[in-house]
Amino acid sequence: DLLTGLTQAEIDRLVEGQYGYIPDGPPVYPMFEHHRHVGLPTLPDHTPLVRAWDFGFRHPAVSFHAFWRCRKAEIHWSLLDAMDGRMVEAIPFAEGVIAYTKTAWPTLDPMMIVDAGDIAGSHVSDTGPGPINILAQPPWNLDFSYKKCDVEPGVRMIRDFLKLPVCKCGESRFLVHRKVRHIIEGFQGGYHMKRAVAGHQVKEDPMKDGFYDDFMDSIRYGAEHHLRSELIDPK
């Protein structure tokens, strides 16, 4: 059997024609465990929906989050969904995200939707204003929070959060929806470090592959804006 010994991701890539990934270095988040971190989270009542954006070149991505406190007053992080665009500019992609949000959460008050990103999305370039600046104008009127989100401290914060045990309320502190396949693949190793080479010091820096890193950067932006403050100033 030609498939013997292959991982599910490799089978998906070779047989099903899906993107998939072939591990080419240690995962950025080795503490991610499918049985503990994948489930069916929903958006709790009276909780803002966080859309975290990464405007990757020709591959923009957005992830949908909820950050909420349980009856034990502990912070929880639910990763509800994600979208990406292939060979599409930021503005048409954003219009699709806005339309999808209305379909997926039809009763959600628009005032309960918050948008976050990295400061790079606001930079003016030779082609004009950054997408964050454009989307702040009519007809979109998105109110972005954005700041410089360095990779290493963000990755470290997420790693530490993934290591937390099940909460005293009985629920996982972090849960990603099982339908968000590319995000799960990213956590499992699609988003990875460079492979170590004998005799050479390899900097612990996530690989930029133009696919998984865009999804995972958006997740890091969401955490920087809405998780870090909860950890610094708990309850």
What label would you give each PLM region?
Residues 210-211:
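C-terminal helical/tail subdomains of lipid-metabolizing enzymes
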Residues 1-53, 58:
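ATPase catalytic-site recognition across NTP-hydrolyzing enzymes
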Residues 72-207, 227-235:
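Mg2+-dependent endonuclease catalytic cores in nucleic-acid-processing enzymes, primarily RNase H-like
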Residues 60-66, 220:
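Short beta-strand scaffold segments in enzyme catalytic cores
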Residues 55, 119, 214-215:
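Generic detector of well-ordered alpha-helical packing
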Residues 214-226:
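Stable alpha-helical structural segments in soluble proteins, enriched in small hydrophobic residues
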Residues 66-72:
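Short acidic-glycine loop/turn motifs at beta-strand connectors
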Residues 12, 223-224, 228-230:
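Charged phosphate-binding loop/patch that engages nucleotide di/tri-phosphates or the phosphate backbone
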